[in-house]
A protein has these predicted regions:
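A detector for small-residue-rich transmembrane helices and their helix-helix packing motifs
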Residues: 1-228
């Protein structure tokens, strides 16, 4: 098991959207647990999940991303959002990041609804979109990772490697049918959406290229090939 704890990229301005999203998800989880205690847990499943008890509704492609099945589900998603969201928010700006997160959640929900057609809940699709954008913007940024494999150790891994492993696991789990209750289609749709959006933003010049993004690394590799 690999758990991201942080990155070596400095944050140039305080994050606002990322902690706000975390607070909203935590608040929604508290309300969920309270509703469960009153015997009204079916309210959330029927009205706010993708393909809940009342079928599909467009607004649920937003609301599902603020709800979680249990504490570990919430904690894992919020940890990934904290680690990867703050650098992406710093790069895209608050409005741009909020738009990426919400649109990424919608894209992930639609992908799940199209191919899975079963109930879905959780921020992981939106967080995957943020992570996919991170891969384009900061592919060589090092991720501080807690590694559980017989022994517990701390390691630094490049973003392309860590995120690549996450994507590969989702693909393999989906193909092999071992994903269980994990909505791998939503994850993969989120990764693809975030990657494409960040790629287009850089390619079009809507955000400035920097020496460490995917485009700059590609140019550096091309120049090295030319000098060989």
């Amino acid at each position: 098991m690999l758990i991201p704890l942080g990155t070596d990229r400095p944050i140039r301005r305080p994050s606002v959207v990322t902690p706000t999203l975390i607070v909203l998800c935590v608040a929604a989880f508290v309300v969920q647990r309270w509703m469960d205690s009153t015997g009204d847990e079916g309210l959330f499943e029927s009205r706010f999940w993708v393909f809940g008890g009342e079928g599909f509704a467009w607004y649920r492609t937003v609301t599902y991303a603020f709800l979680h099945g249990d504490f570990l589900h919430l904690a894992g998603n919020m940890l990934f959002l904290w680690v990867f969201g703050r650098p992406v928010e710093d790069r895209l700006g608050r409005v741009g990041f909020a738009a990426l997160y919400l649109a990424g959640g919608v894209a992930a929900g639609l992908g799940h609804a199209w191919l899975e057609r079963g109930p879905a809940i959780g921020a992981s699709g939106a967080v995957s979109a943020v992570t996919g954008a991170f891969l384009v913007l900061f592919p060589r940024t090092r991720i501080r990772v807690l590694w559980f494999m017989i022994i517990i150790s701390l390691m630094m891994a490049p973003a392309w490697f860590f995120i690549g492993l996450q994507i590969a696991w989702n693909i393999l789990a989906g193909v092999s049918g071992t994903a269980g209750n994990v909505a791998v289609i939503a994850h993969l749709a989120g990764y693809a959406f975030g990657f494409v959006v960040a790629f287009v933003l850089l390619a079009s010049g809507l955000i400035a290229k920097e020496p460490y993004d995917l485009f700059s690394i590609s140019r550096q590799a091309k120049r090295r090939q030319e000098f060989r």
